[in-house]
């Protein structure tokens, strides 16, 4: 899934009833957690012959570079799931220094989203604490993550979430730990009428770099 931000874009939607038009207007008035003005999206699926994570990421990076060169395009980025259209899920996650006193011993996170560089900025998702991903993170030895407000307030209530470790649960204990570097504003992932849930953002560029050095 790719997102492009344009400086000037005219979108014309023809509807057949005033009620539908009013419904669309009302939905757009809801704060979804990101800036929906001037965004155009499309999906891309690479053929099976595209080899491994490294090959796929390089294709995406090349595509984004070319999109950014188009006149009128201010930025372009990519992610694995589009906000407002991502299904609610449940990913077991080890969360260090978890302050909750109830619930399962291994909490479940609703959304894991792998994003390309510049995703939060392109989408207009504010960082409420800490920082966003930086270009230097791609070559950093330590894996980093950005989480949303709901996750931080749920599992690190009363504590500073910045610097806290978490990782996807695995039975073989081989999943890497990610250090939280930033808290992003809540984004409605499953629809404007749904709660934001708990969410983790991981940087695709960093996953690609880790994969390259492990070979």
Feature roles, as predicted:
Residues 12-16, 59, 112:
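Residue-level signal for transmembrane alpha-helical positions in Major Facilitator Superfamily
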Residues 30-57:
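Membrane-interface junction motifs in transport/secretion proteins
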Residues 1-6:
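N-terminal Sec/SRP start-transfer signal
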């Amino acid at each position: 899934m790719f997102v492009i931000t344009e400086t000037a874009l005219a979108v014309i939607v023809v509807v057949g009833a005033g009620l539908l038009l009013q419904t669309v207007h009302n939905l757009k008035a809801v704060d979804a957690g990101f800036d929906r003005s001037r965004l155009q999206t499309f999906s891309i699926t690479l053929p099976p012959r595209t080899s491994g994570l490294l090959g796929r990421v390089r294709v995406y990076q090349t595509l984004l570079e070319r999109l950014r060169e188009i006149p009128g395009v201010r930025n372009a980025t990519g992610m694995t799931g589009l906000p407002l259209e991502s299904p609610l899920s449940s990913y077991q996650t080890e969360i260090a220094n978890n302050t909750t006193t109830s619930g399962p011993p291994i909490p479940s996170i609703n959304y894991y989203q792998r994003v390309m560089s510049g995703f939060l900025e392109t989408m207009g998702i504010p960082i409420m604490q800490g920082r966003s991903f930086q270009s230097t993170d791609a070559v950093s030895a330590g894996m980093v993550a950005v989480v949303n407000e709901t996750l931080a307030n749920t599992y690190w209530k009363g504590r500073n979430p910045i610097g806290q470790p978490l990782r996807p649960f695995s039975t073989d204990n081989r999943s890497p730990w990610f250090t939280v570097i930033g808290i992003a504003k809540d984004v409605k992932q499953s629809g404007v009428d749904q709660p934001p849930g708990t969410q983790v953002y991981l940087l695709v560029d960093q996953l690609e770099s880790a994969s390259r050095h492990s070979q």
